[in-house]
From Swiss-Prot:
Pfam families: QWRF (PF04484)
Residues that span the membrane, as ranges: none
Tissue: Expressed in young developing tissues, such as seedlings, roots, flowers, buds and young siliques, and to a lesser extent in mature green tissues.
Signal peptide residue numbers: none
Name of the coding gene: SCO3
Upregulating conditions: Up-regulated by norflurazon.
Intervals of motif QWRF motif: 463-466
Function: Probable microtubule-associated peroxisomal protein required for chloroplast biogenesis and for the formation of the prolamellar body and prothylakoids in etioplasts. Not involved in peroxisomal metabolism, including mobilization of storage compounds during germination, fatty acid beta-oxydation or photorespiration.
Thylakoid keyword on record: no
PANTHER family hit by this protein: AUGMIN FAMILY MEMBER (PTHR31807), PROTEIN SNOWY COTYLEDON 3 (PTHR31807:SF2)
Species of provenance: Arabidopsis thaliana (Mouse-ear cress)
Protein name: Protein SNOWY COTYLEDON 3
Region ranges (Disordered): 1-129, 162-252, 290-414
């Protein structure tokens, strides 16, 4: 990984432990040049700082870089922006803007100043910054493994000077991911009060800067780990460092470190590694995050968030290494300053505690409606929509119940010192309990992974259920269509069978009628003759009957009847004659009747044979019907096979 050191690292180191103090009533003056606000360098005054290490370390710079380091590295989280914003000048205009700088005290506007702290007022020369930034590059790294995390982190072990080409274009901000959930933040940053460092209660004064009253700033320091989650803030910071490494006037747009602060942090690296190796490894574990998953800008609380599931596999890019190395160095420098009680930034306990409480009370509101964004001029304030969180000066004024633009004495804020300190100590995570927080964070990460796997399995189950339901519905539709087709085929076959049966019955009736007609056609002549014979026979029978009646009924059988024998003889003889005549006619008719009888016997025999033949025909018809049904079924089966 490669880390770019600003111009303050190239300036010779001098001993500035006890310089004369600044006058707090002096106000920084600004001048507009080349479309941007330039701060006027003040007179050569050195500022004593209780945060500077008393040990012999390279931590001082010249007068021109003192104000720059105060404005950038003292806060590392508050980005000062003027009320009127201008785009940063191009690299091609750097020489012109540097040569045209005119610092006139009378032409600069006055700015409001905070009570307890002094604003930075000087900006170093552009050409000096560019030369220093191109001379100092850390090029070699070594990958280690954290025991409780298992992730690799970068640890600078050597230095090598190389030339770096300033980037004139800026990349687009990559897609931001969601911040760490509140549950993971509570697990990863559980406070342990008995392990707090002595300087932990004074962190607010070393991490806050009162900006211009007309501007707004964003606190991206240690409280950002609670406000937005380490992953979100780190991603925003790293995206900004990748998009704007060097601006047109030679200054680093990130605004985290600069001047003597960067030199001090770079030189205090090795001492901090030996003093707090665990903390150094804890802070470094987040600096191997990818360009979309990095920690916040060098904060110790941001290092506590490295177990929250936001650190992913790293891609060692030069710009990523540049930002992470600066975060690590700045964190070591600020941790060392917290133990030093000689800095003027901690001179006012009331302002320090009020700044801490104001930042801490703003964290919950800031976590829900202020995602951090990056702009061409650096980190801008949160959401530029309906609601924008106030700058630290306004938060300080809210916490102390005093106006933001007026100067209040320290006595006004001493009333709530104990309550604010207790609240801060209850919610401030300990640095020494980092491994436990990492374990809890890994537990939360495992839960998140389990929930993610459960969601994936549930989605897969839903997909399979949907596929099975769709297949079942398709099969059901096919089954219904097949059943409908079979039903229609059965109906058509039944209708066809009924029609065939009716046609067969009609055919049988026609055949019987034809047979009867053929038989009766031969007997019609005999029947016509029989009618004539029957008429004559009936006439003769009627005459014989009348003669017998007349002869028998009129005979006096009793009652002493007297008959003439001659007359009786004649009557009987006449009757016999009639009988003989009738016998002759009867004989002639008998022959005809016998012939008719023989014909009728033959007819009976023929009808018997016909009945037998009809029974055989009926059996044949039943067999033909069964065979026809089989034939129809075979035909329908052949038709279905041909369609498929």
């Amino acid at each position: 990984m490669v880390a770019a050191i600003p111009q303050g690292a190239a300036i010779s180191n001098t001993d500035s432990k006890n310089p004369p103090p600044r006058d707090r009533q002096d106000k920084p003056q600004l001048t507009a040049n080349n479309g941007g606000l330039q701060r006027r360098p003040r007179a050569a005054k050195n500022v004593p700082s209780r945060y500077l290490s008393p040990s012999p370390s390279h931590s001082t710079t010249t007068t021109t870089t003192t104000a720059t380091s105060t404005s950038t590295s003292s806060s590392s989280s508050v980005i000062l922006r003027s009320s009127k914003r201008y785009p940063s000048p191009l690299l091609s205009r750097t020489t012109n803007s540097a040569s045209n700088l005119v610092y006139t005290p009378s032409s600069l506007p006055k700015r409001s100043q905070s009570v307890d702290r002094r604003r930075p007022s000087a900006v170093s020369d552009t050409r000096t910054e560019m030369s220093a930034a191109t001379k100092m590059l850390i090029t070699s790294t070594r990958s280690l493994s954290v025991s409780f995390q298992g992730e690799a982190f970068s640890f600078p072990i050597s230095k090598k000077k190389e030339t770096a080409t300033p980037v004139s274009h800026r990349k687009c901000t990559p897609e931001r991911r969601r911040a760490t959930p509140v549950r993971d933040q509570r697990e990863n940053s559980k406070p342990v009060d008995q392990q707090l460092w002595p300087g932990a209660s004074r962190r607010g004064s070393s991490e806050s800067v009162v900006p211009n009253s007309l501007s707004r700033s964003v606190d991206s320091d240690s409280d950002d780990g609670r406000k937005l989650g380490s992953g979100f803030v780190g991603r925003s910071m790293l995206q900004h460092s990748q998009s704007s490494r060097v601006s047109g006037d030679g200054r680093l747009n990130l605004g985290f470190v600069g001047g003597d602060g960067m030199l001090e942090m770079r030189d205090e690296n090795k001492a901090r590694q030996s003093t707090h190796p665990r903390l150094a490894s804890s802070v470094s574990c987040d600096f191997t995050a990818s360009d979309t998953d990095s920690v916040s800008s060098g904060s110790t609380n941001g290092a506590h968030e490295c177990g929250s599931g936001e650190v992913s596999k790293t891609r060692s890019l030069p710009r990523n290494g540049m930002a992470s190395t600066k975060f690590w160095q700045e964190t070591n420098s600020r941790l060392r300053r917290m133990q030093d009680p000689g800095s003027p930034q901690c001179s006012s306990p009331s302002s320090r505690i009020s700044s801490i409480s104001s930042k801490f009370s703003q964290s919950k509101r800031f976590s829900s409606d202020s995602p951090l964004t990056s702009s061409p001029r650096g980190m801008t304030s949160p959401i530029r929509g309906a609601t924008r969180p106030a700058s630290p000066s306004k938060l300080w004024a809210t916490a102390t119940s005093a106006p933001a633009r007026t100067s209040s004495s320290p006595s006004r804020v001493r009333n709530g010192v104990s309550e604010q300190m207790n609240a801060y100590n209850r919610t401030l995570p300990s640095i020494l309990c980092f491994s436990a927080d990492i374990r809890r964070g890994k537990i939360g990460e495992d839960r998140v992974m389990d929930a993610h796997l459960l969601r994936l399995l549930y989605n897969r189950d839903l997909q399979w259920r949907f596929a099975n339901a769709r297949a079942d519905s398709t099969l059901m539709v096919q089954r219904l269509s097949a059943e409908k087709i079979l039903w229609n085929a059965w109906v058509s076959i039944s209708e066809l069978r009924h029609s065939v049966t009716l046609k067969r019955i009609k055919l049988l009736l026609m055949r019987q009628k034809l047979k009867l007609a053929s038989i009766l056609k031969e007997q019609m002549c005999y029947l016509e003759e029989w009618s004539l014979l029957d008429r004559n026979h009936s006439n003769s029978l009627s005459g014989a009957t009348e003669a017998l009646k007349a002869s028998t009924l009129r005979l006096p059988v009793s009652g002493k009847a007297v008959v003439d024998i001659q007359d009786l003889k004649h009557a009987v003889s006449s009757a016999v004659d009639v009988m003989h005549a009738m016998v002759s006619s009867i004989f002639s008719l008998t022959s005809k009747v016998e012939e008719m009888n023989s014909v009728m016997a033959e007819m009976v025999n023929i009808t018997g044979k016909e009945e037998v033949l009809l029974e055989q025909c009926q059996g044949f018809l039943t067999r033909v019907a069964a065979m026809q049904v089989t034939d129809c079924s075979m035909k329908t089966h052949i038709i279905q096979l041909s369609r498929l």
